[in-house]
């Protein structure tokens, strides 16, 4: 019997990939295409939504051709995407009226402040789960309607559609302007992506009418909200995946949770990418943070209650190593930072606080700026390299501590993924400073795997969450080796270093 596969479309910040997974969760093939990063002004980041759609088609076609398989060999397709990135397009032409505004973009800081008013960035957090800053999609839609000529009028007439990248891809995959087999294209999103807009009520999982009015966003623009795992219809009757059912849609960090099999209350994962993104499964009820975290939907299976999560994001992770390499030119390449860090016995009293654009969760100090603290003539570039890696671990502990406090759940192990998890020094130090096991899976492509798991589970390719957990394999586990006194001293010194960075920038904008 011919082997069957599940396809995952992984649309990220820098590239679009199609990965075909076997039944055992292993990767059969990968096709990847990068897209342009557009920086029109300081703090602005845009993508060409048409380029992303074209790259999606190319990646799917190349992956299918690489294995020389047909649509009959693909059971289902799942989609995972960069969250919050916002596309607004004309439903009559299929053309975006402006470039996609990327999640990193900070142009909406003023809009967010305007919305926050005297109540501050937490004004609607008990409804939406998110803070009012430049991250969520809602203020990005507002900016487009306020600044693109004719946009407001078209929106009021019902001619414009909004979507995060998942919605944009789904609309095109199901026919776009022409629809498919007499059906209009699908204009939908899933609960995880909708929870990043600042427009959805986390408890009802519906668009909040009062918030839409407050942001002056016509509800006719907004997609239908559906569970993450279920029947999203089939791909249009042309192209490399023609007729294949779309069965799973998840935002990238939630997909990584699903790929890490974080299905139980108290399961946590941290993704070490450009930034750091930690999520903690909090079960069937949303937990509201008193410690600077946001509340989000983790996933929802069709005909079941949603599962919620707490999330903390840190702006600088792997990008710190890039900064050492490209800006300071202290290291020849990214992998060399590990050997440099291991070449010294300790950090030499040096602490690096990477508050380049303020501090994110859980401190949320937009006034902070980066600093290197504790320098003496003894310190050298190896100490600085070590301090950079240690900063990543300290920031992770801050988020983890906040999660434990907010949830009341003890975290017995931290599952990790992302490019930096291959750095063994960092992983051991991470385990030491949080005094908890750190677990790296064999397959670190957990984001795409999560989309595949979601789609395959819905299609019956896998029978249950338990089956997925049983086939999940561990590559390595790090256990704490550091003594309690040393751990306390290091973390105390880190906190002193961080406090030195406060009140530097006069602007009160939220970091983004």
From Swiss-Prot:
Glycerol binds at residues 83-84, 135, 252-253. ADP binds at residues 13, 17, 274, 318, 419, 423. Sn-glycerol 3-phosphate binds at residues 13, 83-84, 135, 252. One of its GO terms (cellular component) is cytosol. Its EC number is 2.7.1.30. One of its GO terms (biological process) is glycerol catabolic process. ATP binds at residues 13-15, 274, 318, 322, 419. InterPro entries: ATPase_NBD, Carb_kinase_FGGY, Carb_kinase_FGGY_CS, FGGY_C, FGGY_N, Glycerol_kin. Keywords: ATP-binding, Glycerol metabolism, Kinase, Nucleotide-binding, Transferase. GO terms for molecular function: ATP binding; glycerol kinase activity. Pathway: Polyol metabolism; glycerol degradation via glycerol kinase pathway; sn-glycerol 3-phosphate from glycerol: step 1/1. Key enzyme in the regulation of glycerol uptake and metabolism. Catalyzes the phosphorylation of glycerol to yield sn-glycerol 3-phosphate. Belongs to the FGGY kinase family. This is Glycerol kinase. It comes from Corynebacterium kroppenstedtii (strain DSM 44385 / JCM 11950 / CIP 105744 / CCUG 35717).
């Amino acid at each position: 019997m011919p082997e069957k596969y599940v396809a995952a479309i992984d649309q990220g910040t820098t590239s679009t990939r199609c990965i075909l997974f076997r039944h055992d969760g292993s990767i059969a093939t990968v096709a990847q295409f990068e897209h342009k990063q557009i920086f029109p002004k300081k703090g602005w980041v845009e993508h060409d939504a048409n380029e992303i759609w074209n790259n999606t088609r190319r990646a799917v076609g190349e992956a299918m051709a690489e294995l020389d398989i047909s649509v009959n060999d693909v059971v289902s397709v799942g989609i995972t995407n960069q969250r919050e990135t916002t596309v607004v397009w004309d439903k009559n032409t299929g053309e975006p009226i402006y470039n996609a505004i990327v999640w990193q973009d900070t142009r909406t800081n003023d809009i967010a402040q305007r919305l926050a008013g005297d109540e501050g960035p937490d004004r609607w957090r008990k409804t939406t789960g998110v803070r009012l800053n430049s991250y969520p999609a809602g203020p990005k839609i507002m900016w487009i309607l306020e600044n693109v000529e004719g946009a407001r009028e078209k929106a009021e007439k019902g001619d414009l559609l909004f979507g995060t990248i998942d919605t944009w891809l789904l609309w095109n995959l199901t026919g776009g302007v022409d629809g498919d087999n007499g059906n209009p294209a699908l204009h939908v999103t899933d609960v995880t992506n909708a929870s990043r807009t600042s427009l959805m009520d986390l408890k009802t999982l519906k668009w909040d009418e009062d918030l839409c009015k407050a942001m002056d966003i016509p509800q006719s623009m907004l997609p239908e909200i559906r569970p993450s795992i279920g029947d999203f219809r089939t791909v249009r009757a042309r192209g490399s995946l023609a007729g294949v059912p779309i069965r799973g849609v998840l935002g990238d960090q939630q997909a990584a949770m699903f790929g890490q099999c974080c299905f139980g209350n108290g399961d946590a994962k941290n993704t070490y990418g450009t930034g750091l993104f930690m999520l903690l499964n909090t079960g069937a009820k949303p937990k509201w943070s008193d410690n600077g975290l946001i509340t989000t939907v983790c996933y929802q299976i069709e005909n079941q209650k949603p599962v919620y999560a707490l999330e903390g994001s840190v702006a600088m992770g792997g990008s710190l190593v890039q900064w050492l390499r490209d800006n300071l030119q202290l290291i020849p390449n990214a992998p060399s930072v590990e050997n440099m860090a291991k070449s010294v016995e300790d950090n030499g009293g040096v602490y690096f606080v990477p508050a380049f654009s303020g501090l994110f969760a859980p401190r949320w100090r937009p006034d902070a700026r980066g600093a290197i603290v504790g320098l003496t003539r003894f310190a050298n570039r190896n100490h600085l390299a070590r301090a950079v890696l240690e900063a990543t671990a300290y920031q992770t502990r801050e988020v983890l501590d906040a999660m434990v406090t907010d949830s009341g759940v003890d975290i017995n192990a931290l599952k990790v993924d992302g490019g930096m998890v291959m750095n063994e020094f960092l992983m051991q130090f991470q385990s030491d400073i949080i005094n908890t096991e750190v677990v790296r899976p064999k397959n670190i492509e957990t984001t795409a795997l999560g989309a595949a798991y979601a789609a395959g589970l819905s299609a019956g390719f896998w029978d249950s969450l338990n089956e997925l957990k049983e086939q999940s394999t561990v590559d390595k586990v790090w256990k704490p080796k550091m003594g309690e006194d040393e751990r306390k001293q290091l973390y105390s010194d880190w906190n002193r270093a961080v406090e030195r960075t406060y009140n530097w920038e006069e602007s009160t904008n939220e970091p983004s």
